[in-house]
Swiss-Prot record:
Residues of the active site: 243 (proton acceptor)
Protein name: UDP-3-O-acylglucosamine N-acyltransferase
EC number: 2.3.1.191
Transmembrane segments: none
Sorted UniProt keywords: Acyltransferase, Lipid A biosynthesis, Lipid biosynthesis, Lipid metabolism, Repeat, Transferase
Gene, per the UniProt record: lpxD
Source species of the chain: Amoebophilus asiaticus (strain 5a2)
Family that this chain belongs to: Belongs to the transferase hexapeptide repeat family. LpxD subfamily.
Subunit relationships: Homotrimer.
GO MF entries: N-acyltransferase activity
Catalytic activity: a UDP-3-O-[(3R)-3-hydroxyacyl]-alpha-D-glucosamine + a (3R)-hydroxyacyl-[ACP] = a UDP-2-N,3-O-bis[(3R)-3-hydroxyacyl]-alpha-D-glucosamine + holo-[ACP] + H(+)
Pathway: Bacterial outer membrane biogenesis; LPS lipid A biosynthesis
GO biological process terms on file: lipid A biosynthetic process
InterPro entries recorded: Hexapep, LpxD, Trimer_LpxA-like_sf, UDP_GlcNAc_AcTrfase_non-rep
Amino acid sequence: MVFTIKEIAQLIGGHVVGDASINIHKLCKIQEAIPGSITFLANPSYEKYLYTTQASAVIINNSFQPERSVSPSLILVEDPYASFTKLLAHYYQAVLNKHKVGVEEPAHLGKHVKLGNLVYRGAFSYIGDYVTLEDKVQIYPHTYIGDHVSIGENTIIYSGVKIYAGCQIGKNCIIHAGAVVGSNGFGFAPQPTGSYEKIPQVGGVILEDNIEIGANTTIDRATLGNTLIKQGTKIDNLVQIAHNVEVGKDTVIAALTGIAGSTKIGNNCMLGGQVGVAGHTEMGDRTVVAGQAGVTKSYKKGNVTLMGMPAIERKKYLKNYAIFKQLQNILQIKKDEQ
């Protein structure tokens, strides 16, 4: 699609300095831009590229004063990063994520299924019995939707996703390729003989509205009750969420994190990559866990940053790490004193 600089400025609420009639057909990084493209400058360390970029337009802070003349037209805004994000979202919807409608055969549709308006079902998708798909749901090819699943309006289920029976998916959710929702929790009872007997997992999974689940992430069903992911939460690729976990609103969880069973995570928390969380622990609201940390106990008060293994509060961790880096010198001093 092609937009003029003027049209883009109107979309993001900016003011144009330069030629507003130029057509824009591509979004680029500032250092890789070409004629006919638009980019943005938010980080001062990239200012040098402003004077050499081939972009036709640059979104920039309205208080910015260039050191010398620039060739591209400028779109002045209050927050360049937020404005470019808005532009990306518009481009994504208009160009990359056009809503599909209808059925691609072959596709299986079970008994007593409730279909909303403008639903898309891709080839080789399987929809079980008593499923509800609300308006504008998109089910991409090679997807499995088990019996008694409900999926809210405008939700997108990408190829290869498996949603087991009885799970509830809210509105405006995105579940990326290969994710599994509702598989059995890891529950096994040790026996006197040394073997393990499987504990039936008869609960469900509830994903509230506006949730995004990354590729190949797994969310286990509860033993009893529900594994619950609350609205607005974003989960990266390759994350494991065990049975009966509760994740609060607007929390973000990075890739390769594993959260053990019956853990409760509050609202607005941030978990970095490769974090491990022990079962039956609790984190309060606005807890931040640094990458590769291992949380072994509860931090119910929230508003804390945790680092290390086992995870401790950031200030204490940094003090301990400073000492750790000096251990060799300290040992040498002790040897010299003997």
